[in-house]
UniProtKB/Swiss-Prot annotation:
GO cellular component: plasma membrane
Membrane-spanning segments: 8-28, 45-65, 72-92, 109-129, 141-161, 176-196, 203-223
Protein name, per record: Uncharacterized protein aq_1828
Source organism (scientific name): Aquifex aeolicus (strain VF5)
Keywords: Cell membrane, Membrane, Transmembrane, Transmembrane helix
Membrane-topology descriptor: Multi-pass membrane protein
Family the UniProt entry places it in: To P.aeruginosa PA0043 and M.thermoautotrophicum MTH1451.
Disulfide bonds: none
InterPro entries named among the record's database cross-references: DUF4010 (IPR025105)
Domain of life: Bacteria
Record's subcellular location: Cell membrane
Length: 230
């Protein structure tokens, strides 16, 4: 598909973020090497697709167990708000390079095999989660969340929301598990951009990866202290 202009690129990121922010990140990272003068625009567009992922996670959680929404938003909103502010700053800084001319080809992020893949991942994670919860407690859920988030964020989100709704795991555990899945997914995408993106994009996502690690580690420490004191 051919896309022209700043508006079209941003729209592509927003629409593409609905099924897969990972696909958007990969596509735009690859394009940034050819159109390096648009690195700020690509970064801004990628972060927008991540923001769509955030709203998707909130939406899925609300459908399954709305009682989790408050804690999940409390954990994730500051992170995505700061990312968006950073992206807007860079976008405005590099605005003079965002020419309307030229065209680029972007692969469609949708795939006919997505539904089958999602079902397979969900079933696998569901089986593993019961084993880990039984043998390793909440820590097993956290490990599973972090690892599964690399592959698919939707499956682990739906699963943890369902388990929390049934009372099999606590709301705090489910919310922290979803947080870990989101962060591992963002770290994976950041890593891809660092490896395959333009020089500027590499630097921008190095900051994102570092911020993600600091944010996640801080919340884990606070979460552990709160649980120890309760």
């Amino acid at each position: 598909m051919k896309y022209k202009g700043t508006g079209s690129l941003i729209l592509t990121a927003l629409i593409g973020g609905i099924p897969s922010s990972t696909a958007v990140t990969m596509a735009f990272s690859n394009l940034s090497r050819k159109f390096s003068y648009l690195s700020e625009l690509f970064f801004f567009s990628i972060i927008l697709s991540w923001l769509v992922m955030f709203f998707r996670v909130i939406f899925y959680t609300f459908i399954i167990f709305e009682g989790m929404i408050y804690k999940l938003v409390l954990l994730l909103l500051p992170y995505f708000a700061l990312l968006l502010m950073f992206a807007i700053f860079l976008y405005l800084k590099g605005n003079k390079n965002h020419e309307e001319g030229g065209s680029m080809s972007i692969k469609n992020p949708f795939s006919l095999s997505q539904a089958f893949t999602f079902g397979l991942i969900y079933s696998t994670i569901s089986v593993i989660s019961h084993y880990l919860k039984t043998h390793f407690g909440d820590e097993g859920i956290y490990v599973l969340s972090f690892l599964s988030g690399i592959m698919d964020i939707d499956a682990i989100t739906l699963l943890l929301a369902r388990l929390s709704d049934k009372g099999e795991i606590g709301v705090d555990v489910a919310a922290m598990g979803i947080l870990l899945a989101v962060m591992s997914n963002n770290l994976f995408k950041s890593g891809y951009a660092i490896i395959f993106g333009s020089k500027k994009l590499k630097i921008y996502f190095l900051f994102v990866a570092l911020f993600t690690l600091i944010y996640t580690t801080t919340l884990l420490i606070l979460f552990d202290k709160l649980h120890m004191s309760s």
